Swiss-Prot record:
Protein name: Kinesin-like protein KIFC3
Residues reported in the UniProt entry to bind ATP: 526-533
PANTHER family noted in UniProt: KINESIN-LIKE PROTEIN KIFC3, KINESIN-LIKE PROTEIN KLP-3
Distribution of this protein across tissues and organs: Predominant expression in the kidney, testis and ovary. Also expressed in brain, heart, liver, lung and uterus.
Bias (Low complexity) ranges: 33-46
Sequence ranges assigned to domain Kinesin motor in this UniProt record: 443-766
Chain segments carrying region Disordered: 27-79, 771-824
Amino acid sequence: MVPSRRTWNLGATPSLRGLWRVGRVQEPKPGMARPAPASPAARPFPHTGQGRLRTGRGKDILPSGEEDSTSRTAARPSLAQCRALSVDWPGPRSPHRLYLTVQVENLKEKLISQAQEVSRLRSELGGTDAEKHRDRLMVENEQLRQELRRCEVELQELRAQPVVPCEGCEHSQESSQLRDKLSQLQLEVAENKGMLSELNLEVQQKTDRLAEVELRLKDCLAEKAQEEERLSRRLRDSHETIASLRAQSPPVKYVIKTVEVESSKTKQALSESQTRNQHLQEQVAMQRQVLKEMEQQLQNSHQLTVQLRAQIAMYEAELERAHGQMLEEMQSLEEDKNRAIEEAFARAQVEMKAVHENLAGVRTNLLTLQPALRTLTNDYNGLKRQVRGFPLLLQEALRSVKAEIGQAIEEVNSNNQELLRKYRRELQLRKKCHNELVRLKGNIRVIARVRPVTKEDGEGPEATNAVTFDPDDDSIIHLLHKGKPVSFELDKVFSPWASQQDVFQEVQALITSCIDGFNVCIFAYGQTGAGKTYTMEGTPENPGINQRALQLLFSEVQEKASDWQYNITVSAAEIYNEVLRDLLGKEPQEKLEIRLCPDGSGQLYVPGLTEFQVQSVDDINKVFEFGYNNRTTEFTNLNEHSSRSHALLIVTVRGVDCSTGLRTTGKLNLVDLAGSERVGKSGAEGNRLREAQHINRSLSALGDVIAALRSRQGHVPFRNSKLTYLLQDSLSGDSKTLMVVQVSPVEKNTSETLYSLRFAERVRSVELGPGSRRTELGSWSSQEHLEWEPACQTPQPTARAHSAPGSGTSSRPGSIRRKLQPSA
């Protein structure tokens, strides 16, 4: 600090900025201990009176807020000491420092009083009526718990009594209702406990919030007090510096006057003194400038003090508002808590009263039920005595029942033997009747199916319908050709609206004949695009004749599994450009030939034709999926996927009767013929032209065979085509044959439709004679002696019942081969 009285040393005069810098350095840093306050005698300002501040004009100023804080000055000795000083301020703005100090002390006292008020509120909160009421409720809850425990003990005692429950008893229902009410009361008590804990938690949260607001206010007031202290120190240092400068001014003047009366000997010293004097004047001007800056800073401090007062007032108002809100919320919570507790207590009292009343009724009912319990106990003892003698009665009854059951089993066995003999006799009769029915229907049955009109048929006159049906006779079809109606009579005619199942109903009788040991052939005929492949194969969602025939075949085999053992093998081939190819072989392009068996039996077989043994329809589908991909189809003007070859699906069924040893061999040939077409209309060129020529040539050979059979010629030209040669067994009286004629209904295809229907009529008039059944009577009758021929890629027959030449059952010693003719 700069001392209040100091003599200037002219030899080393410091600048005013340096003095100000020294005063700033001596100021204590934050966190360091402040020096002890100077005594009144050492202070630079003498005091004039008690509690008054004297200004430079001699007026007394009473500090604001003194009358309001006189009751609390005894607890603050520093404030009393500050008021006891009377300072003679050198400047017109000097009283503000002490005034600010007084205001700071007043704020501190207010903070202390507020802290005391908060602690008083906390002490009052500890003993409010709400908490007393809460304690009282806790005591009441404890009493209710004791009452509930006592009721539970009584209920357990009642349950422990040996009471026999009775269904529909009014007392048991009341007891269950009481138990339900008791559980509800327990739940409500638990809910009341939860509500009470929530209210206590809310009160604790409000108290914590108030404490947090008080801490923030204390921190703010402490910061403001530190700022006031710092400004006070700077103001005090400034005044001390000004006072010291004023005190040193007279010696300078005296030196100047003394220099004026000196002799000439000291002129040199005079000039030096003048230089120093000029330097001192500059320093005085600088000090005046610094003084102005200090006054400006003092004014800024005054403005800052005003702002701090406004903030303090705002904080006080906020604290008061928060305090009021807290009191209102606490009062509201207290009221809600009291109201909830009263409602819960009243409800608990009412329900507890009802529980006590019901419990008394239950006790009365239990007392009335004791005689009934004694009666039931006596009845139970009597039943127990009867049960002791029950095992003897049960053993006697079991012996008699066993004897009756044994006698009944013997009678059933004898009846079963008789029924088995009758069943076999009826089975043979059914086969004879079925074969007779098929024979009476005709050797080659012909059915026609008309496909619907499609978008590929186009529009205009050529796409009009030229086919009509007889509503009274489903075997007649009418065709309008060149303006003239032509009628045809077949075995069955199906309209475009007929389903795949309707068509298959005409076929399923032949499948049964195949299982019985007959050769069956089903083939589709018609122009390309007439729907032959759809009728034979169909789609996965709506299968055709092939899939349905195989499903029926395996279904019939499964039904006869208890009496017969069957072995089913399949093979597939196609005739493409008069070349026979194996669709299931490893090399589908390999050419195969049709040979006669060298044993002289007249049977035909195809060397190298692949044959697979199957157990279900799924096995067949997996095998034929590969074969279907190998079949030749191409695009023509008449059909996008035109079949360019004749496809044959050959299924061989070999069966053995487990009881008689009778062996049967049936073969099912499913043939999808390639479509007949006119070369000019189908647009065939190159390979397509050569394919069409071969297809038409083979179908023409088929027509020649049908014509020879119809006229009963001695020589039938089966060898003119691979197709007719392969179908020789199916067309020579050794098979049951069905032909499906597919026709198109539109006007532009009437020529092909007319040709197909005429060919169908010629086929229908052919008489082949009754079909023969392939059977062999073995020399054994038990299933354990059955031997199956393995299914492998060896030469297999394609049109006869046996699989290979010389390997059939005819070469087995002691076997008999005969044909069973159906009785007329």
